[in-house]
A protein has these predicted regions:
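Conserved Walker B
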Residues: 63
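Short catalytic-loop micro-motif centered on adjacent basic/acidic residues
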Residues: 57-60
């Protein structure tokens, strides 16, 4: 029976797999969507859903894995029509533009996630966090270190997990070379040069027209630095000029190597500030300045107003609220240095770099009340095993070191049960109130900013989750629905301001610290209110957000840098969103002081509190009860 089959079973590590895989997953074979017949067969269900008018849009996962993303997306656009939403999970580099010729409304929003997270990072902590990382892991994980590690890990992935794909590519290069270039290049030299070229590519895929010079620039640089590779590079270039299989496979392999080497490996090794190690992230760049943030939002409003923006997805390595907690480490970086050193002394780890990476994630999901239940313990231990396998230093998915993995889970258990537990409790309580403020403000900016915001399941409440399967846990929608009904009732009856004032006074009387002592108690309701009001406003006035202008809003005064604001509108300004940056440092300086913000002409009402303002107002008055505000001009009907 076996002899009569048109295939032969092979060991995957021999590097002779003859079918295209989804990255390195042997059980997922790539389908040739470039074949019109296959496209028709695989899109029958989608065509039926479109015919029955059951869906409003389509999200395309990993288009960089396709042979021809342009043609595929054009066909898909023809299938679903011009009026339906079409977004692509295209992971962009920091300076990489989305090709405007693609038949999509934009990306799925990981580029926006980097911006929305980065604006809340306290950049003053960079040196301190770098030195701590150097002490704990042997690397500062700054931009240069990240770049070096990225190149090394991409080479490793190309030589191991994706060796079969590299060998298929080199064979295609030989076939597509119709010149005499590189005729004397050995297979070994060609393969080594291909690996180095793939590792040097700074983007997932460089055959988009907007990146047309990327490959030639890298090739020219390699010729200059490695003269001995000239013949091999001539051979590769000649093959690419044929516009055949080699060029296509090179583009596909680059994306797979980038994903496996960076997202799935490097981002589980680097440990300076793990909140920045997200899909589409740039952890070597320590945060985003206000100037960069505003310019990027304006660009999105002009070029991609219908792109998705996101903070949490099924693929993010941490939920938005977990990342907010970790981001707040930067506001208490000196305390964190002390905590990390104490934990290292009290609870020796099987590996210091692993421990430093895991400690930040532990802080991210540690219960603020210190109630580390068995469920929390299980979640953290499961995450730790997944993280060390992804990192691939001491164990991996293919070569499990059960002794090391047991040592890591025992270390997590010792954190929970041992003397370090109370220290983590204290630190988490200190940064949590800042994290909630970041969560609320960042959500507000996402909802009011350019693009179409996506709210992942359950994220309208504060949710402290890690990577899958942790972010696929049960969501209590009944509780959320009941809370939303209560909010609507309070809003309709005009009780919101009074209820917030009462909650603040009660929390102050109980001795809770901070500018918003009541925020921890009402965190879920506050975040849900932000989501509800933002989405409601977008639904009532889609033109303001889908085609409206974007303007930055700036404060004036000693605490001006702590305010990040934006205004949206059509033929004028209609909506203003304000959020608090670096809230704990603001608290340290005693609050907003005499800092002011000047509103456009007319009366502006905060949808969250019901308070109204005009002209130049003190920020402390606008953000009296909540660290974020959604101001709507009186001429806007709501």
């Amino acid at each position: 029976m076996y002899e009569r089959q048109n295939y032969r079973l092979m060991f995957w590590r021999d590097g002779v797999i003859s079918y295209r895989r989804f990255f390195s997953v042997n059980g997922l074979a790539g389908i040739r969507q470039e074949d019109p017949l296959i496209f028709e067969h695989t899109h029958r269900t989608l065509r039926q859903l479109i015919a029955e008018d059951l869906i409003d849009g389509v999200r395309v996962d990993h288009p960089d894995g396709l042979a021809d993303p342009f043609t595929y997306l054009n066909r898909l656009r023809d299938l679903i029509g011009e009026d339906r939403w079409l977004v692509a999970e295209k992971i962009l580099g920091v300076t990489e533009p989305l090709d405007p010729r693609l038949a999509v409304d934009g990306t799925t929003g990981y580029d926006a996630l980097r911006e929305l997270d980065g604006i809340f990072v306290s950049r003053e902590a960079e040196d301190s966090m770098s030195m701590l990382s150097l002490q704990q892991s042997g690397s500062t994980w700054d931009e240069a270190a990240i770049a070096a590690a990225e190149h090394t890990l991409k080479r490793d992935v190309a030589q191991s997990e994706l060796a079969a794909e590299i060998r298929r590519l080199t064979r295609a290069i030989r076939r597509d070379n119709f010149s005499t270039a590189g005729a004397d290049v050995s297979d070994e030299d060609l393969e080594r040069t291909v690996i180095d070229l793939v590792a040097a590519m700074p983007v997932y895929r460089a055959d988009y027209i907007s990146l047309s010079r990327q490959t030639s620039t890298i090739v020219a640089d390699m010729v200059r630095r490695f003269p001995s590779r000239r013949a091999a590079l001539d051979l590769i270039s000649a093959a690419f000029l044929a516009n055949g299989e080699a060029k296509t496979r090179f583009a596909q392999v680059c994306g797979a190597v980038m994903a496996k080497g960076v997202e799935d490996t490097l981002f589980y090794r680097a440990c300076r500030l793990v909140a920045l190690q997200e899909v589409g992230g740039a952890p070597g760049r320590f945060g985003v300045s206000a100037a960069e943030f505003h310019l990027l939002q304006q660009e999105r409003a002009m070029l991609w107003p219908h792109a998705m923006t996101t903070l949490t997805t099924h693929d993010t390595k941490r939920s938005e609220d977990t990342r907010a907690r970790i981001i707040e480490i930067t506001e208490r970086h000196k305390d964190f240095v002390e905590l990390a050193q104490q934990v290292s002394a009290l609870v020796p780890a099987p590996d210091d770099a692993t421990a430093h990476f895991l400690l930040q994630n532990v802080i991210g999901v540690w219960p603020v009340d210190g109630g580390t239940t068995d469920a929390v313990r299980d979640r953290l231990q499961d995450y730790a095993v997944k993280a060390v396998r992804e990192a691939g230093v001491h164990t991996s998915w293919f070569d499990n070191d059960t002794h090391f993995e047991k040592a890591v889970t025992d270390w997590v258990d010792a954190l929970i049960e041992g003397p370090a537990s109370s220290m983590i409790d204290d630190f988490v309580r200190e940064i949590h109130r800042g994290a909630v403020q970041v969560s609320l403000g960042r959500k507000m900016l996402q909802l009011i900013g350019p693009g179409i915001p996506d709210t992942y399941q359950g994220q309208e409440f504060v949710d402290l989750s890690l990577v899958d399967p942790d972010n696929r846990r049960f969501v209590d929608y009944v509780n959320r629905a009941q809370a939303l009904d209560q909010f609507k009732e309070s809003a309709l009856s005009g009780r919101i301001h009074g209820e917030l004032l009462q909650a603040r006074d009660a929390a102050t009387a109980e001795g809770h610290p901070g500018l918003y002592p009541h925020l921890e108690e009402i965190a879920d309701r506050a975040k849900q209110a932000v989501v509800h009001e933002g989405v409601y406003l977008r639904r009532q006035h889609p033109d303001v957000f889908l085609s409206g202008d974007y303007q930055a809003v700036f404060a004036v005064g000693e605490a001006a840098s702590h305010l990040i604001g934006m205004a949206r509108g059509v033929s004028g300004l209609d909506v203003i969103a304000l959020a608090t940056r670096r809230p704990l440092l603001l608290e340290d300086r005693g609050g907003w002081g005499e800092t002011t913000v000047t509103l456009p002409e007319g009366r502006w009402t905060d949808r969250l509190t019901g308070k109204a303002f005009e002209g130049t107002v003190a920020v402390r008055e606008v953000l009296d009860l909540l660290p974020t505000a959604l101001l709507v001009a009186d001429h806007v009907e709501v």
